[in-house]
Amino acid sequence: METISAAITKNNANESFCLIHAKNNNNMKVNEADPLNWGVAAEAMKGSHLDEVKRMVAEYRKPVVRLGGETLTISQVAAIAAHDHGVQVDLSESARDGVKASSEWVMESMNKGTDSYGVTTGFGATSHSRTKQGGALQKELIRFLNAGIFGNGTESNHTLPKTATRAAMLVRINTLLQGYSGIDFEILEAITKPLNKTVTPCLPLRGTITASGDLVPLSYIAGLLTGRPNSKAHGPSGEVLNAKEAFNLAGINAEFFELQPKEGLALVNGTAVGSGLASIVLFEANILAVLSEVLSAIFAEVMQGKPEFTDHLTHKLKHHPGQIEAAAIMEHILDGSSYVKAAKKLHEIDPLQKPKQDRYALRTSPQWLGPLVEVIRFSTKSIEREINSVNDNPLIDVSRNKALHGGNFQGTPIGVSMDNTRLALASIGKLMFAQFSELVNDFYNNGLPSNLSASRNPSLDYGFKGAEIAMASYCSELQYLANPVTTHVQSAEQHNQDVNSLGLISARKTNEAIEILQLMSSTFLIALCQAIDLRHLEENLKNSVKNTVSQVAKKTLTMGVNGELHPSRFCEKDLLKVVDREHVFAYIDDPCSATYPLSQKLRQVLVDHALVNGESEKNFNTSIFQKIATFEEELKTLLPKEVESARTAYESGNPTIPNKINGCRSYPLYKFVREELGTGLLTGENVISPGEECDKLFSAMCQGKIIDPLLECLGEWNGAPLPIC
């Protein structure tokens, strides 16, 4: 019987052997200090989320993606998927030997009579069957997996988007380059050529459960490579190509491939379609997360919010890094903002004009967004690990001369990450809708007109009322999409695939969520720009009203009928306080109307002064009551003309007071929307609808044009909150 000490010695020896073996295997990297990869995962999360997004954007714009199997990023996948700036794919020559070795091992193993899954056996629940016709087996694999429906001749489109297909091709190449899959390097080169020539195989939209990988859609890439008659592709201009035409256009100077043992399985048994689409989704999700932080800050500006909600101590005491960063980003935008300075003065004039604290959609936006940023960031890292993983079965370990039968094809990281991301997107959308609802509601928006209407006649301008209804629709659909996909697993393939990830389905639903959040973001930003312009108009109109009231007060209240100084001259200061405190859009359509608050409160000032005028009121020459009618008549004569003059000057681009936004850190986004996209102030007098303007921004957002102005808003941020003073 073996002694305990002997057993320990033996185990230590075996452990040392395994580590030495791993170090000597060129295809494997073992970190003795971090054998479970938790350290690597934690290291990847260092630094700010914004810096990571900036790196993503920079990487997205590089002209070449060099594949080696282990360094692919989601931004590179997104770049190849979009192919909007001609980015090309290069394969690392250093990977050729490893790929070749695993391919040769499969052939040698079969020639020796070794029994290997998918090489000499059937597939899945029927793997008990055996054959020596390895090539024919691969051919049959592709045939029976071509089970997708495209809906040709119907109105429905059941073809996977080209972007997702291109992403899948790139990810599958990257996986196979690691040399554990038993496939010829020439096949990987052949998949690369259509990517570089924008020739895209047609894959079915549905039909995969992403375990055992994305079998059905990936089989159509294999079908094109093998020249199956049902294979189709799209050319650069969208033209439909058969397999031969696709080969010619892609520059594949070879006949269709006759797949060797294991090669068909290597092509189809992976998670590339789900993880490819997930990469595209997460690139956009990271941009939208930063955008939501900046839009929350702009919302605070136009709502005359109190900036203390971003104070670093508050968020430091909560400890969550996403929250701390979200608050710091908002703090940076608001620091030095002209809107914040003006709001501070306003709050000092009348502390009771608005609640002591802003509502939750403004005040708790960092606490709301922070965890969502963390979820999106963690999901990004999870998918980045997945697209650099070897995820087929069996795996060929040439160094140990064996095929490993496992389950890396299980795409659970995709399904879970996409479900979590979709939930985060829905929560961002909910915050955005709450902010939008406050912005258009004159009970909550601190003086902006109802529905953000900008016309002279508000009874014929309902502004963003339709947009608010649309936002409710978007938000409802987005929240419905937040329901998890991964809880709907069905047992498949004769109960062999009895648990499966549904990774691609979840990625597809998250892609839908991205689109809806982009609709919401574009609508919200157009509304914020409207609010910015209304604040500018408000300031100019108030200035005109204030000057006119001052002018009329001096003219009518300073002197008595006999040329003596009149007691009513002391009313001017209080009259101007009324103008300062009263919301312009509450009266500006008819500024002298006796039913509107301005006229009522101006009169009240004169009445109050008259009541304390004492005995002087009994004298006609010194009576303030006697001046009220004169003051009001003069104001009615002058004020409407001056208000119209101020509005006309504003509309012609020559306002007396410049727009505060010009000196704010949020200006690049405003400038992009107004100048680059050519949008303007929406009014009922104008034929342009809100949807037309939102459409311009949505299209630009889908093309990535919002990224530069967004990052420009944060260009001066040093990655840290302001010091606690």
From Swiss-Prot:
<keyword id="KW-0585">Phenylalanine catabolism</keyword>
<feature type="binding site">
    <location>
        <position position="465"/>
    </location>
    <ligand>
        <name>(E)-cinnamate</name>
    </ligand>
</feature>
<feature type="active site" description="Proton donor/acceptor">
    <location>
        <position position="117"/>
    </location>
</feature>
<dbReference type="InterPro" id="IPR022313">
    <property type="entry name" value="Phe/His_NH3-lyase_AS"/>
</dbReference>
<comment type="function">
    <text>This is a key enzyme of plant metabolism catalyzing the first reaction in the biosynthesis from L-phenylalanine of a wide variety of natural products based on the phenylpropane skeleton.</text>
</comment>
<dbReference type="Pfam" id="PF00221">
    <property type="entry name" value="Lyase_aromatic"/>
</dbReference>
<dbReference type="GO" id="GO:0045548">
    <property type="term" value="F:phenylalanine ammonia-lyase activity"/>
</dbReference>
<dbReference type="InterPro" id="IPR008948">
    <property type="entry name" value="L-Aspartase-like"/>
</dbReference>
<feature type="binding site">
    <location>
        <position position="357"/>
    </location>
    <ligand>
        <name>(E)-cinnamate</name>
    </ligand>
</feature>
<dbReference type="GO" id="GO:0005737">
    <property type="term" value="C:cytoplasm"/>
</dbReference>
<dbReference type="InterPro" id="IPR024083">
    <property type="entry name" value="Fumarase/histidase_N"/>
</dbReference>
<dbReference type="InterPro" id="IPR023144">
    <property type="entry name" value="Phe_NH3-lyase_shielding_dom_sf"/>
</dbReference>
<feature type="modified residue" description="2,3-didehydroalanine (Ser)">
    <location>
        <position position="212"/>
    </location>
</feature>
<dbReference type="InterPro" id="IPR005922">
    <property type="entry name" value="Phe_NH3-lyase"/>
</dbReference>
<protein>
    <recommendedName>
        <fullName>Phenylalanine ammonia-lyase</fullName>
        <ecNumber>4.3.1.24</ecNumber>
    </recommendedName>
</protein>
<keyword id="KW-0456">Lyase</keyword>
<feature type="binding site">
    <location>
        <position position="496"/>
    </location>
    <ligand>
        <name>(E)-cinnamate</name>
    </ligand>
</feature>
<dbReference type="InterPro" id="IPR001106">
    <property type="entry name" value="Aromatic_Lyase"/>
</dbReference>
<comment type="subunit">
    <text>Homotetramer.</text>
</comment>
<keyword id="KW-0587">Phenylpropanoid metabolism</keyword>
<dbReference type="GO" id="GO:0006559">
    <property type="term" value="P:L-phenylalanine catabolic process"/>
</dbReference>
<keyword id="KW-0963">Cytoplasm</keyword>
<feature type="binding site">
    <location>
        <position position="363"/>
    </location>
    <ligand>
        <name>(E)-cinnamate</name>
    </ligand>
</feature>
<comment type="similarity">
    <text>Belongs to the PAL/histidase family.</text>
</comment>
<feature type="binding site">
    <location>
        <position position="393"/>
    </location>
    <ligand>
        <name>(E)-cinnamate</name>
    </ligand>
</feature>
<comment type="pathway">
    <text>Phenylpropanoid metabolism; trans-cinnamate biosynthesis; trans-cinnamate from L-phenylalanine: step 1/1.</text>
</comment>
<feature type="cross-link" description="5-imidazolinone (Ala-Gly)">
    <location>
        <begin position="211"/>
        <end position="213"/>
    </location>
</feature>
<feature type="binding site">
    <location>
        <position position="269"/>
    </location>
    <ligand>
        <name>(E)-cinnamate</name>
    </ligand>
</feature>
<feature type="binding site">
    <location>
        <position position="493"/>
    </location>
    <ligand>
        <name>(E)-cinnamate</name>
    </ligand>
</feature>
<dbReference type="GO" id="GO:0009800">
    <property type="term" value="P:cinnamic acid biosynthetic process"/>
</dbReference>
